[in-house]
Amino acid sequence: KKLGVHVKKKKIKPWRFDMARNESLKLVPDDFDICVCTDLDEVLEKGWRQKLETIWDSNINRLYYQYNWSLDEQNQPIISFYSDKIHSRKNYQWTHPVHEVLTYLGPTKEELKVTDKIVLNHYPDRSKSRSSYLPLLELSVKEDPEDDRNMHYLGREYMYYGRWNDCIDTLIKHLQLNSATWKDERCASMRFIARSYKNLKRYEEAKMWLDKAIIEAPYLREPYAERVLLEYQLKNYQKVIEYGSKALEIKEHPKSYMNEPFSYDETIYDMMAISYYELGDYQKSLEYNKMALKINPNNERIQNNQIILENLIQKKN
């Protein structure tokens, strides 16, 4: 209000994100052409409006744009994917109590366009509680038990809460749905099942599910990287090197909300360096430690490992 914004208030009881967004959408005049939906913790990079007006035409219903969901201290993206909350004013409504999505209701086929020119950055409040998400996700699955996306989200949320058995049961249900056909998401469900088994110390079942995840999406680094983490925890250093090498063969980094930072940061190089050290191959260890240090030059432990390895090799020679 202090900035001159015309603020409208409405109580949504019980709280649902879809209902709140639909009430917000009703406030947009019917003669507007384009709606750009952002949250208070999201900031569009400068020049977005001019770019949008250049890209948009009357045939487009929805625009996909780059969404940097997570950024590092230098404001460089860690996890990026395409979001789709720029849309035409008419023929849309929000659905699902949480992790709400825009549902197209138009009489003709929805026309989509993708751009990398418009970028939205996410700066979340880390102190904000997520406690409302779980009951809303449970409600969402109850309302639409055949929706694969929300079944996946619910299983993932159980994992966040350390409810390992609930996570496993829910994600197996996700994989059994006829609509659950997106291999990347299926792979993520399998990884999360494996992660739950790992936390239950049922390591062979964790390995089995990671094998399934690799078969499901062999083009993704994530299942290999997850296997690296497991084998490292179990001190199976030869296996760390085996799966780490396979992970590093995959160069493509697709934009997806299921990207795991540990798949593309220094983690794999670091664990391979330590594994080579444990197996007595100091030269290889140094090689991978250098690569880890190149990605994260401020990591003191990796810096110290570099000095130790260089001294060991020097003494050996």
PLM region spans:
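Active-site nucleotide-sugar/metal-binding loop of Leloir-type enzymes
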Residues: 22-34
